[in-house]
A protein has these predicted regions:
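Bacterial N-terminal signal peptides
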Residues: 7-16
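Central antiparallel beta-sheet cores of small beta-barrel/beta-sandwich binding domains
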Residues: 22-132
Length: 132
């Protein structure tokens, strides 16, 4: 009996020291930084905050002065293909509509990325963001 208690105590001690891995939730949820190359209206660098409310992907690009609101977004789990449309304004107040298409890379990693292309009525280019 005493051996059993000692073995049980050692097992509990080992289990307490083991790392705990939690489920992360939606693969797009979180803060992202990256670039949309060649964007002369809003600059090459971008910061995004994305969320999943249980029904839809929501978010903002460059929150603050350059708020670009994501109007619609879809994520196809087959191939992890992302499509979103966003609306911002240039310095004169004219509406700029963005369409971004990309694919999630390194899905299993915390610092996964989305790589693809962006386009608007003012240009097009490469798009890449990495989750922070």
């Amino acid at each position: 009996m005493r051996t059993f208690v000692v073995a049980l105590a050692l097992s509990a001690l080992c289990a307490a020291g083991a790392p705990v891995v939690a489920q992360e939730g939606h693969p797009l949820k979180g803060s992202w930084i990256g670039t949309w190359a060649g964007n002369t209206v809003h600059g090459n660098d971008l910061f995004m905050v994305l969320d999943w409310n249980g029904k839809a992907i929501t978010g903002t690009i460059n929150p603050g002065q350059d708020n670009i609101v994501i109007k619609s977004a879809t994520l196809n789990p087959e191939g992890w293909v992302l499509h979103f449309e966003a609306e911002g304004k240039d310095k004169a107040g004219a509406v700029i509509n963005y369409v971004v298409d990309g694919k999630i890379e390194n899905l299993a990693m915390h610092n996964r990325s989305v790589t693809g292309t962006w386009k608007s009525q003012r240009g097009t280019g490469a798009f890449k963001i990495t989750r922070q």
